[in-house]
Amino acid sequence: MARTVPLERVRNIGIAAHIDAGKTTTTERILFYSGLVHKLGEVHEGTTVTDWMAQERERGITITAAAITTRWTKRDPKNPSQPLAGAPEYTINIIDTPGHVDFTIEVERSMRVLDGVIAVFDSVGGVQPQSETVWRQANRYNVPRIAFVNKMDRMGANFLKVYNQIRERLKANAVPIQLPIGAEDEFRGIVDLVRLQANIYMDEIGKDIRPAPIPEEMKDLVAEYRAKLVEAVAETDEALMEKYFAEEDLSEADLMAGLRKGTISGQIVPMLCGSAFKNKGVQMLLDAVVDYLPSPIDIPAIKGVLPDGSEVSRKASDDEPFSALAFKLMSDKYGDLTFIRVYSGVLTKGTYVLNSTKNKKERISRLVVLKADERLDVDELRAGDLGAVLGLKDTTTGDTLCDENAPVILESLYIPEPVISVAVEPKTKADIDKLSKALQALAKEDPTFRVSVDPETNQTIISGMGELHLEILVDRMLREFNVEANVGNPQVAYRETIRKPVSRVEGKFIRQTGGRGQYGHVVIDLEPAEPGTGFEFVSKIVGGVIPKEYIPPAEQGIREACESGVLAGYPLIDIRVTLVDGSYHEVDSSEMAFKIAGSMALKEAARRANPVLLEPMMKVEVEVPEAFVGDVIGDINARRGQMEGMSTEGGISKVNAKVPLAEMFGYATDIRSKTQGRGIFTMEFSHYEEVPRSIAEAIIAKSKGSGVTN
């Protein structure tokens, strides 16, 4: 089957923002105006297409990244209500991502497979903590983006305030290509700075849009921001710069070409405005998506590693060998769905492919594209497509699927570590097996959700990104798997690390039991690594003092020993282990012996290397009426918090601090009682930091007395 839409007319985009900035409503309006749905869905009524899980509709938040395919034809500038005659149709694959920090992995895995992002900002709140997190994630994968300042109809809406915040707090080159006409109740239209025309909304559902002259009172402001736009575009290209110096202006075509080039290269973030809920600005936003965000062929070719370790690029083309990345797993009543982004080649139903990450073959029995929870069967997925495969056996998030005859492993995802744990136990004996199956299914879907068993208490421990994350997962166990469970109090995911390097520490495992014995001997150096690096292993074995087949088992033993540190049994992180020496026995050496020797060496080295306990520090932003700010700051200090700044605007104070997670349990209730219900806060993981000695001693003593949950 031939490609129906050429690759240059495909857009893979995400819609991402802080919670409550209006991402899901923006997505719903995109689906409405592009004709995919014929009735407007509302988050507060629980009728949206992309929020399809029961918990999402109840809570009014997006939890999972929902993928949807729609079509768009550009509007006619002279009659913005209508498509441009003869204009081609574009395919837009959209992923609506969560804004709550507990669901960061959903945003992370979406960013990995997207070509462009619409970053939605609340016109009142502006740049909020999760906006910064989303921005960092987009930076990590170099994703081009456009900014949509939403909710221009809200009390306190201020487009230019958000413009300044994006430039100052996100350090981004935000360039308005629109200005709002009016704000709050008076918001009635948008000035297009590229075409220098006003567009006025004449009806409530945003379908009757009429061009008009720029209002007299806005002419100076429009001239100022048009000049900024022209200058920013000129700086992206030498030829445009010369033209700008010669003529002091650029044509509409020059501006659009320069904006596209600057957006795709990350030099420019075009800024648009509107009110998705009031149906204003969404069609122009869609035009900007096709005008300025990249197609799969505009972005650098995906890089991968061949079986021999050499690097290779796979271009976005149907003619290249097939390669795809699995970015999300989902189970529902129809079976297991694996969402994939096809980077090169064609995937056809009924064929076999290789999961090169696990070196397993997978059969492609069914392929679907999604309209949220509705599935449309297709025969193939081509380069640049987002879709899902049903019934894969061994594939998990971050795995590469590829042509068996052209194996490659694509760069995977960054997966953050869980910071909070709780014990769960089934309410009845009948629930024991069901609990185990439910936890396995949920852990397979969500790589930030971990399941372990405490070796001392034999309790099942679940770990995740925050209290809401675990609450939703426990709720899903009840709804989807019919499992009732008792849930313990939250526990902090402490970690251990070392403060000084130690060299030439031996691990020797010798056992003679009659017949063949066991012999493994390794010598390691252990040193602290950069915070955030986790675990690094380097082998400097030369001359065959340890045969190469015994080095991976030694590394495995070292890695497994890191799972339970020497102070309190918490995982050991941010260390570098170098295998420097060892010996072996021709007859008695085995993989198991070297695995045990590696584990022994690591434990001994960690004891000597000044081990310390680490705790997760959270980035906390509290918004309270000015009158309560003194109490809030005092409370943060009492929680061992470190103040990082404060600002006050319109009688509302924003307090920024870093606070240990251990001190933040129950804060939602405390902040409400301290501020008469008027305080709100957001919290996200920042980094690990050493626990003060007196507190560390108590944690270590408790872990030795009662077992440890990690």
Curated annotation (Swiss-Prot):
It is found in: Cytoplasm. One of its GO terms (molecular function) is GTP binding. GTP binds at residues 17-24, 96-100, 150-153. One of its GO terms (biological process) is ribosome disassembly. PROSITE patterns: G_TR_1, G_TR_2. Residues 8-297 form the tr-type G domain. It comes from the Bacteria. Its main location: cytoplasm. One of its GO terms (cellular component) is cytoplasm. Keywords: Cytoplasm, Elongation factor, GTP-binding, Nucleotide-binding, Protein biosynthesis. PANTHER family: RIBOSOME-RELEASING FACTOR 2, MITOCHONDRIAL, TRANSLATION ELONGATION FACTOR G-RELATED. Belongs to the TRAFAC class translation factor GTPase superfamily. Classic translation factor GTPase family. EF-G/EF-2 subfamily. Catalyzes the GTP-dependent ribosomal translocation step during translation elongation. During this step, the ribosome changes from the pre-translocational (PRE) to the post-translocational (POST) state as the newly formed A-site-bound peptidyl-tRNA and P-site-bound deacylated tRNA move to the P and E sites, respectively. Catalyzes the coordinated movement of the two tRNA molecules, the mRNA and conformational changes in the ribosome. This is Elongation factor G.
